[in-house]
Amino acid sequence: MVKKKSKFRHISIGKKKYYFYKIVWYDILADGSHASATEFDNMKPALMTTMGYIYKKNKKCVWSFASYDDETFSDRNVFPIGCIK
């Protein structure tokens, strides 16, 4: 018998489940050099993609991680909600 795949991909650490997400977000673009007004007008934030597990979230931020063991988390990020597409 083939086990049906779960609708949601998750892991369990301790007694808590962490769900896997694709997070699309805007990264700040900075440039310390001299530039014309046209070059400045053409600057845009980079659209980034992060794949990982959601550790927690609130109204201001989302915490994520991509690597883990039985007790610790690594490849961690904290995204301000306003940066997430």
Predicted segment positions?
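Conserved RNA-binding domains used in RNP assembly and mRNA/RNA metabolism
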Residues: 2-85
